[in-house]
Swiss-Prot record:
Coiled coil: none annotated. This is RNA pyrophosphohydrolase. Its cofactor is a divalent metal cation. PANTHER family: NUDIX HYDROLASE 26, CHLOROPLASTIC, UDP/ADP-SUGAR PYROPHOSPHATASE.
Length: 166
């Protein structure tokens, strides 16, 4: 197995889904190797980029697969890629030990539908990644995620703060 320091980052997309009031969708994770802290189980949708897929296409697909949200409008794309390292203690279990963390392209997306459109139990027929969800004020997000993702969430909040609600 490669040394942790030599492992690449997995490229993926992250989606900040905002309702018309400027609150952000967060989902409570089903489980998985990233859940090392039971007090921090919430996160925004994120996922991999398929071969041949552009970043916005990946964001739309992943959002549908995780939330069932179809009524959306792109607000902004982050200017930079944001990266995080997963803790060494779970690096061998996450992504079969092939990556040291993720390199993420983030999007701010307006949800224009009714809350009943969101379905995390069986989103668009895909396996559930969340067991619960809610709308949360943007400034609260960094304190709800696992600590190793917190710096990315702080940057995402700063990048998209102009879309926050009161």
């Amino acid at each position: 197995m490669a040394r942790y320091e030599d492992l690449p980052y997995r490229s993926c997309v992250g989606m900040m889904l905002l309702n018309p009031k400027g609150l952000v969708f967060i989902g409570r994770r089903v489980g998985g190797t990233e859940l090392i802290d039971p007090a921090h189980v919430w996160q925004m949708p994120q996922g991999g980029i398929d071969p041949g897929e552009d970043y916005w296409e990946a964001a739309q697909r992943e959002l549908l697969e995780e939330t069932n949200a179809r009524s959306i409008e792109k607000l902004a794309e982050a200017t930079d890629w944001f990266t995080y390292d997963i803790p060494r203690m779970i690096a061998g279990r996450s992504w079969k030990g092939r990556y040291r963390g993720q390199r993420q392209k983030w999007f701010a997306i307006r949800f224009t539908g009714d809350d009943s459109e969101i379905n995390v139990a069986s989103p668009a027929g895909h396996k559930a990644e969340f067991v619960d969800w809610r709308w949360e004020p943007m400034q609260n997000l960094p304190n709800l995620v696992v600590p190793f993702k917190r710096p990315v969430y702080e940057r995402v909040v700063k990048e998209f703060s102009r879309f926050a609600g009161e």
